[in-house]
Curated annotation (Swiss-Prot):
Pfam families: DsrE. GO terms for cellular component: cytoplasm. Belongs to the DsrF/TusC family. Heterohexamer, formed by a dimer of trimers. The hexameric TusBCD complex contains 2 copies each of TusB, TusC and TusD. The TusBCD complex interacts with TusE. The keyword tRNA processing applies. Keywords: Cytoplasm, tRNA processing. It comes from Salmonella typhimurium (strain LT2 / SGSC1412 / ATCC 700720). This is Protein TusC. It is found in: Cytoplasm.
């Protein structure tokens, strides 16, 4: 079975990319357990708690990330450099994601056969 990586690299609510990626991730998790989830660049904002998407007339899909345990999605990484650049090092995110430096993150990403970016 191919290993599939989902990479979230865009901020939430500015486009449908994050929501579509999350929908694809949850659907794919029904077919395989060989999944990895990566949050890089502005994608780290996907995991911030306390977002108010209704203020910009967007759907609140961020709470759906909390379903990772229910879907047995446990391979989750977040870019440590992206967190530092955005001043987010000491935040409790909506999911448990392991911070990795860019070199280690690229190495981990290299273990996947398919990479889908949202």
């Amino acid at each position: 079975m191919k290993r599939i990586a989902f990479v979230f690299s865009t901020a939430p609510h500015g486009s449908a990319s994050g929501r579509e990626g999350l929908d694809a991730l949850l659907a794919t998790s029904a077919l395989t357990e060989a999944l990895g989830v990566f949050f890089i660049s502005d994608g780290v904002f996907q995991l911030l708690p306390g977002q108010k998407p209704d203020a910009v007339l967007a759907r609140d899909y961020i709470a759906t990330f909390k379903l990772f345990d229910l879907y047995d999605i446990d391979q989750c990484w977040i870019c440590a450099a992206s967190l530092r650049e955005r001043g987010l090092e000491n935040i409790n995110f909506v999911v448990d994601a392991t911070p990795l430096e860019p070199v280690a993150l690229r190495r981990e990403l290299g273990n996947y056969d398919v990479i889908l970016r949202f």
